């Protein structure tokens, strides 16, 4: 799977979509499914004999393309028009398809209540039908939407139903997404043990699928869950695997985030030398991609770790670099923090004259 096939949505969920799906990478530790270009031909025939049906199909195809381009408002308009035409000709299966896709689009746009409404309408049309794939999609949208609305009991209810169907269909990719979503719900509830159980199942499947992008995300999720449980050795084990894959995929931003987590986990274990190693790697990556915020954070982390080792001179060097960068970014808060750390490091060295050079 190529990097271009991965989505950059920042939502912390994994929606399933119609009807052929594949994994894409997203920000903040998530995996998502998207249409591939070939799937549209399976949804709609290229030509229809009935004018209304032909126009409805055209609008549905157009809505799909607009959603893929991130044009959610125009996608909603096209899909609503398509739905009206399918309703006029009484085509219930196509209405269910459009409603399910409207659930996805409104979910993607952050309108979770609308996503729930569309998905519930879709399910009501699917009663007593054998279209398990579409039911699976609608259940996924419902579960993810309820999670964002912090209704975790309903989120679990719908996602467990979704997972059951993925298992019936033996759809490994959708099963992976459902497991990952359930893990995220339990993480939001603070039940990290249950979240880890789902994520561990996700890891087995993603490795079976030989999907490196998906594996990177699942490893990161597992590392985060173990970190939240203060089990830093296990967190480090998963993060280290994750960063190797992220580097091989040239996913520099993800590698940068995981290196930060690795440094923090090592610091929590009082392994300051190893923490410095990871912070330095992150600093190098931040400079390569000209990410000033990550660079500023890395410099601060390095200073703190050097202080922990008693190397105040090196800590001062990092803090001074951080101070210059914070000023260039016009980041008053980071500037004040850097000044405070500089004064403290100078006092620790007994260099009171130098400490007085730093205002604040």
Question: PLM features: what roles do these ranges have?
Answer:
Residues 316-330, 336-360:
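TPR/TPR-like (Sel1-like) alpha-helical repeat modules
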Residues 78, 248-251, 268, 273, ...:
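Long, mixed-charge, low-complexity intrinsically disordered regions
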Residues 1-111, 123-124, 353, 357-360:
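Flexible inter-repeat linkers and adjacent short helices
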